């Protein structure tokens, strides 16, 4: 099972363009916020104290969540490719049960999603610290990491259900 997890991680990170594309949803949201929405929202929420800091932290949390969803979905593309190319059938001939095979895809996806969310958080945090001079308390980093991992688990599990159902439905239609 560990070998299959390593395989899935190697395949995912070998495709540099695919890695970049999996973060594209989050990056597009980030650039839209910076370019178009930030000043509009700040002027609309003027009555609140520390408006810019509240909005920036809110955007960080929302966009990091988007990164978790999109990267986990992209990472599960390997499951679809393996089913399509019948690699899944070869894997089922090993001593791994279908549950263990699915768990290996899920574990690799959770790792990928967590890592990409951390990278997204880091990029956004550095930008907002440098440009908007916000402060992120160090006491918030550990709970934030917990929620990133929790979000990665949730997004990966939901996306695995969606992808598995779609693959099974396609398999029955194609046969």
What are these regions (language model features)?
Residues 98, 104-175:
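Alpha-helical transmembrane segments and their short interhelical loops
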Residues 28, 55-128:
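Hydrophobic alpha-helical transmembrane segments of multi-pass membrane transport proteins
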Residues 1-13:
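A short amphipathic helical element positioned immediately N-terminal to and/or at the very start
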Residues 11, 91-93, 163-167:
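Helix-capping/transition residues at the boundaries of transmembrane alpha-helices
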Residues 41-42, 78-85, 132, 164, ...:
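Perimembrane helix-loop junctions in membrane proteins
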Residues 39-53, 129-139:
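Short helix-coil transition/hinge motifs at the ends and kinks of transmembrane helices
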Residues 11-42, 55-72, 113-117, 174-175:
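Hydrophobic alpha-helical transmembrane segments of multi-pass membrane transport/permease proteins
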Residues 18-19, 78, 101, 171-173:
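Alpha-helical transmembrane segments and their helix-entry boundary regions
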């Amino acid at each position: 099972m560990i070998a299959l997890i390593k395989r899935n991680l190697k395949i995912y990170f070998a495709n540099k363009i695919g890695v970049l594309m999996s973060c594209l949803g989050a990056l597009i949201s980030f650039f839209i916020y910076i370019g178009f929405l930030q000043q509009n929202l700040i002027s609309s929420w003027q009555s609140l104290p520390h408006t810019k800091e509240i909005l920036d932290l809110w955007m960080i949390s929302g966009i990091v969540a988007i990164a978790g969803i999109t990267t986990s979905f992209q990472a599960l593309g390997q499951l679809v490719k393996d089913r399509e190319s019948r690699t899944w059938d070869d894997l089922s001939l090993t001593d791994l049960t279908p549950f263990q095979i699915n768990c290996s895809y899920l574990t690799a996806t959770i790792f990928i999603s967590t890592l990409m969310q951390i990278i997204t958080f880091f990029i956004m945090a550095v930008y907002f610290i440098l440009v908007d001079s916000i402060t992120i308390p160090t006491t918030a980093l550990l709970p934030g990491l917990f929620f990133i991992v929790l979000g990665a688990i949730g997004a990966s599990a939901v996306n695995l259900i969606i992808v598995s159902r779609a693959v099974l439905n396609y398999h029955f239609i194609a046969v």
